[in-house]
């Protein structure tokens, strides 16, 4: 049998197979960053994955910055997510929540009134974000976090992990790449601090380390994972030593019995992120590298990691696990509907069986 379909345990997470649905922003949350019925159906359809990592979700109002993205700091948001987790669990699935604080990669047009845009240093990201009200806009000029502000953000993450468990999630993942707040602290280009949270790699990874420690202390380390992509330049990230930075974080959290490290292939030539992770992290690896079925199985069979994650393939193939199991053709997603409101391009992709039945008729 293909290794892909063997069960695996990651910390406290028992997976029926080694196929993980990667977290993907889809911009379908309702007003006030509340998950709605379309999100319930979307995740329910994909519950065949051994593990779903639900989309990046703000731990606080300050953590928001994109349009129609969810959060988990209010009672209404927790209730919305609870409907999602109940639907996934009813199908026999497992689901964790990716916590994503966008930091400076934000626009006030996408935030509640009074929610500040913060960063390790007062340096604006040279990029734009979309807003429903104003279209493409420049990112905000961020406020540099004070020492007290850093502790407040860490507490927001800790409480968000507790809220996630209250909502029924099996665990949480810290988003440490794509130019969001943890990565802004980690990268030398966006972190110009001269205190304990800046300077060398050990200082720059301290924020992410303390967030992971806080979440592990709140819900148990075996229910916490983190995601890395060394050298990812997205959202105007520049780091002079991406390999050393990633290694420093892996080593800093190595004493914690975390569930997993979700490691993405680096876009930088000569930087083998998977090998770096194996050398510097004791944690089980979820690999992400634009896999198809055969390449994913080969990676697992060779011992490169414990599981593999798929992103794009899960968009248009809600039954991806069964398609891979039986070698069936994969549908292609419509790029135009990736971030548009409503069911189109979200919950209306048919299963292979549904297509076959329609053809037969």
Where do the language-model regions lie?
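Flavin-dependent oxidoreductase catalytic cores
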Residues: 1-361
């Amino acid at each position: 049998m293909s290794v892909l379909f063997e069960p695996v345990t990651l910390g406290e997470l028992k997976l029926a197979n080694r196929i993980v649905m990667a977290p993907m922003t889809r911009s379908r949350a309702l007003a006030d960053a509340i998950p709605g019925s379309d999100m319930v159906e979307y995740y329910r359809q994909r519950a065949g994955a051994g593990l779903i990592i639900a989309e990046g979700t703000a731990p606080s109002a300050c953590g928001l910055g994109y349009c129609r993205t969810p959060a988990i700091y209010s009672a209404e948001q927790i209730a919305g997510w609870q409907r999602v987790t109940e639907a996934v669990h009813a199908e026999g699935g497992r689901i964790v929540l990716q916590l994503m604080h966008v930091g400076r990669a934000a626009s006030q047009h996408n935030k509640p009134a009074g929610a500040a845009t913060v960063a390790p240093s007062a340096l604006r990201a040279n990029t734009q974000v979309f807003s429903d009200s104003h279209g493409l806009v420049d990112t905000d000029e961020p406020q540099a976090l004070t020492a007290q502000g850093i502790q407040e953000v860490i507490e927001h993450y800790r409480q968000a992990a507790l809220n996630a468990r209250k909502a029924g999630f099996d665990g949480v993942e810290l988003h440490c790449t794509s130019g969001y707040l943890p990565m802004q602290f980690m990268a030398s280009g966006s972190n110009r601090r001269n205190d304990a949270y800046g300077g060398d790699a050990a200082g720059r990874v301290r924020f992410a380390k303390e967030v992971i420690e806080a979440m592990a202390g709140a819900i148990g380390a075996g229910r916490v994972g983190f995601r890395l992509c060394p050298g990812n330049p997205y959202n105007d990230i520049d780091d002079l030593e991406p390999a050393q930075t990633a290694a420093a974080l892996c080593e800093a959290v190595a004493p914690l019995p975390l569930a997993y490290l979700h490691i993405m292939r680096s876009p930088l030539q000569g930087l083998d992120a998977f090998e770096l992770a194996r050398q510097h992290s004791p944690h089980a690896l979820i690999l992400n590298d634009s896999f198809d079925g055969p390449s994913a199985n080969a990676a697992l069979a060779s011992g490169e990691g414990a599981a593999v994650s798929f992103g794009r393939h899960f968009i248009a193939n809600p039954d991806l696990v069964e398609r891979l199991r039986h070698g069936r053709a994969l549908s292609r997603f419509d790029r135009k509907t990736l971030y548009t409101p409503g069911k189109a391009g979200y919950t209306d992709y048919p299963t292979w069986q549904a297509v076959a039945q329609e053809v037969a008729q």
